[in-house]
Each structure stands twice: as C-alpha cells, then as structure tokens.
C-alpha cells in the first residue's frame, strides 16, 4: 500500500518503507530522528518548480501537470514503477515536510505512482 505522511508525525510500523521526497532536508531533524529508509530528492520537484508553486492552492492543478512532465522529462518512470511494485508487497510511505497536507509534492507523486500501476492491481 502506498501512503503519504508528514515528517512531523511520529513514525510507525505501519509506515513500512519510508521515502523522504523533499528536495531540501527538513529543518530540525537528524537522519536518525527522521526515520527514513531513503531520501529521494531526485524525485522532488525542481527548485524552480517548487519556488514557482510556493504551495499556493490556486496553482495546484498546474503544479501537478508541470511536476508530472518534469518526472517524464527526467526519465524517472522506472524509479516510480519500482516504488509502485514495492507498494504491492509492503507498505511504502512518501514522507514530506510541507504544512499543506493536500497540496504538496507527495500528494502529486502518489497520484503519479498510482497511475503507473497496471490495471487490475488497484487495492480494494
């Protein structure tokens, strides 16, 4: 199962494999405190896209599309497919630090990863 979680929420066993998807390391956390298994800053939005978006909900739809195009352009599909495959076998949690829990890169990235799953593998 693929899920998302703010880094400021306590880690739990249910998180499974935790992947930090922020380009910048979250303030106030050591690597031990973050309890992440991977830091995939290469999957985060570019600095220019992140700054343009600025977590403005009015820009959300366009941000999602630009971010998807960025991932395609940077040939990240195989990396995202690997995450989707892992999420079929175990819990995978995309960890983020944004305050807005509805309009952030982890939400958009989860949507992209879920769209890559072959039909018939959706969770019930």
Each model region followed by its residue ranges:
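Residues lining hydrophobic/aromatic ligand-binding pockets adjacent to catalytic sites
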Residues: 1-124
């Amino acid at each position: 199962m693929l899920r998302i979680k703010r880094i400021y929420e306590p880690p739990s066993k249910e998180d499974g494999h935790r992947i930090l998807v922020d380009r910048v390391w979250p303030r106030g956390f050591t690597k031990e405190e973050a309890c992440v298994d991977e830091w995939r800053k290469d999957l985060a939005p570019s600095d220019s896209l992140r700054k343009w978006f600025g977590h403005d909900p009015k820009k959300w739809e366009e941000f999602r599309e630009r971010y998807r195009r960025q991932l395609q352009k940077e040939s990240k599909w195989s990396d995202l497919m690997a995450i989707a495959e892992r999420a079929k076998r175990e819990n995978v949690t995309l960890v983020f630090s944004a305050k807005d829990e509805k309009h952030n890169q982890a939400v958009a990235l989860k949507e992209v990863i879920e769209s890559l799953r072959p039909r018939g593998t959706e969770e019930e």
